Amino acid sequence: MAVYTHISETDLKTFLASYDIGNALVLKGIAEGVENSNFFLQTERGFFILTLYEKRVEEKDLPFFLGLMEHLSRRGLNCPQPVHNRSGHALGRLAGRPAVIVTFLEGVGADVADARRCAAVGEALARLHQAGADFAGKRTNALGLAAWRPLFETVRDRADTVAPALAATIAEELDFLEAHWPRALPQGVIHADLFPDNVLFRGETLSGLIDFYFACVDAYAYDIAICLNAWCFEPDLTFNIGKGLAFFTGYEHVRKLTAEEAAALPVLARGGALRFALTRLVDWLNVPKGAMVNPKDPLEYMGKLAFHQTVGTVRELGLLR
């Protein structure tokens, strides 16, 4: 989450007039994250999150995201619910941007990713995969393998200002991934961005999943790889195999991985690391002037990629097959 677009009091009042949630009492920008403009909204009738969609989110995809959240909620997954206005629409416009109000979930992001929480996240991800299996909406992964080289080309000539030889390292990894990317794996709806700040806890209990704006239809194992990268590394970029074991235990408590998925995970983890290194690199080099956003360090994910380049089998990630 972040703030790129600022909202005037007059515009907010006009926007809220079409809803049955009362007048605004508090509107506070949320600096965390990098994709959309997000605000904590308190009205006379409760607490909400107001999102203005920017950058990589295309307006045509919003019905998929909003419909998915409603579908997952009906299947028992605790996630934000779009608030509909009096005309029955969840999607509106505010400050020249597509805008949505969603319900506020109690809980805080996981500042500490210990093994217990990794297990809870693994189980929650598997339940998400199961719950989304019969969702009728379709959306291809706009940041999948096919998007990485074009994305890289937008910053290739500046990459080495971030780290020496970074452009060559990325180009070499792209060549490898394009030659070895796993195909024909089980797929369905994936979250694709289930980082610790998108998982809420109340104490040690997982209370909800948020930020579904990269959700798409892709390989379930790729979603797992993203989570391993987000949850199972230590601050010094060493991989904690105990956390990996806990994550897989939680996931397979709900859904067993196929042999093909397990074998593919080392390559998928490399791809997941490069995907986030690339988008972070683009963001790092293109922070809009005046934006309330804290860009993430792309070199963190290059370090994770370097680890995965040494991995031979999924056992080294914690799946004991």
From Swiss-Prot:
InterPro entries per UniProt: Aminoglycoside_PTrfase, Homoserine_kinase_II, Kinase-like_dom_sf, Pseudomonas-type_ThrB
Keywords for this protein: Amino-acid biosynthesis, ATP-binding, Kinase, Nucleotide-binding, Threonine biosynthesis, Transferase
Molecular function as annotated in GO: ATP binding; homoserine kinase activity
Top-level taxon in the UniProt lineage: Bacteria
EC number in record: 2.7.1.39
Reaction catalysed by this enzyme: L-homoserine + ATP = O-phospho-L-homoserine + ADP + H(+)
Protein's pathway: Amino-acid biosynthesis; L-threonine biosynthesis; L-threonine from L-aspartate: step 4/5
Family stated for the protein in its record: Belongs to the pseudomonas-type ThrB family.
HAMAP family: Homoser_kinase_2
Name under which the protein is recorded: Homoserine kinase
Source organism of the structure: Beijerinckia indica subsp. indica (strain ATCC 9039 / DSM 1715 / NCIMB 8712)
Gene name in the database record: thrB
